[in-house]
Amino acid sequence: MVVLKWTNKYSGETGYVASVSTKVQCFVNTFNMDDAKRYSEKAVKGILTKLDNYHETDNNIFEMIEA
């Protein structure tokens, strides 16, 4: 299982994805890796596509981290 770490391209702030809201089309962040949602590596591709479609990748870089 992996978690998604995000880094803001402009501020350098970092954290983890706690959830992805399809209703609001955004992600909810957490600064504690223990609170981050665990994903299978297979599921991450779809999550990253959603985040790109929600324009979250305009300001953030997402990377997989082993949980």
Predicted regions and their residues:
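Short, mixed-charge low-complexity intrinsically disordered segments
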Residues: 33-67
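Short aromatic-glycine-(Arg/Gly/Cys) micro-motifs in beta-strand/loop hairpins
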Residues: 1-32
